[in-house]
């Protein structure tokens, strides 16, 4: 059952109050935080304030929506007015935005309870959340392994019941890959379906905000709360938003599902391949027609992405110069200040990608690299369009392997290969979802479901049908009992963590 629906029922029947629920999640968050390090900032005071406001509405007899009173975690690259937004970078360590991102504003208006800002790879550049300037987040299933990235803090928080749902951003797989590693559901919406206003930019033509949840329905409900046109975002689509909960039908008889042959071959681990093939067989047993699909351009997706994304990043990150906001290193000249600020403010991976992007955009190399990459991007889009002439959705593994050990992949190329299966979806701007489909040595494996543009409903329907006929989503990491799904108490055996203030003021600290 959806966690959101279960809690909503408890709230409207007055079985429990929003403040009680918020306190239990905050307690569990504090208990597990020394082990997981999912959060950069915990907004306890804000959460309790928002929860009390929901309780006041209920006492007044006001009807509340399904998201009201639900604990939410927010990736720390989404601007939150009065609460620092660091992007896990020394460059923005003390930055307190004077405005609110559209998605967080919409969820606050819906009555959600923000428990904190989650850890990520610096400026969302990474696949393991090891590139954070502040801390390394651990995977709740195995504390010696990564949670994925760049939205690793959000995925870990949902998997460990530190929050009911969370927001992440996905540029090359940064929602789907950590969702797979942490055994939760994560959705990257169609590019432009969700506003990017207030999202600190990495690669503007690829970035998209999306939801994490323990179930497909939780993700659908959160997507409902954030989707829709925003005049503050020039890339926002003017389209009607369907009721995504209406797509949650456990019947896919007659659906045509394409298996991306290119993503099940070389580079895919044996255990992952076996789990995904079993999931495909299960979808067939549910009545879907399975077709094999060739997408030959996908093999060039990784190289294409690592030209386009760093090129856009090099332009976007040029604004961090020590003049307007963020870190400023003392220096005896303007040029020296630029150099010292950027040298001390950015971590190694961010510097690497800025250099790659600057090189690709430089005179004499623009045509050979950037322009050619854009042409290949068009070919990838065309391969998807051809595939969707034959099928309703496409499926593949989300990641080549389950979560790897912390510190295991020091070579940048081996880290980049983690996003091999998710990157083409970003290049084409399509919706993609990951949900659990098995385990290997106690670690979750993710199934990726991809739809045509604005076909989130089809993606959610197939995911829901699979989820409702399996029990992978019901498994929990070995971190004690969940805090409030069924009104259970939190695990008293975990150490207490220091609480941190989260007032909407310039005094917010972590």
Curated annotation (Swiss-Prot):
Region (Disordered): 471-510
Active-site feature positions: 75 (charge relay system), 150 (charge relay system), 174 (acyl-ester intermediate)
Protein name: Glutamyl-tRNA(Gln) amidotransferase subunit A
Organism: Synechococcus sp. (strain JA-2-3B'a(2-13)) (Cyanobacteria bacterium Yellowstone B-Prime)
Gene Ontology CC terms: glutamyl-tRNA(Gln) amidotransferase complex
Domain of life assignment: Bacteria
Catalysed reaction equations from the record: L-glutamyl-tRNA(Gln) + L-glutamine + ATP + H2O = L-glutaminyl-tRNA(Gln) + L-glutamate + ADP + phosphate + H(+)
Claim: Manganese is one of the keywords in the record: no
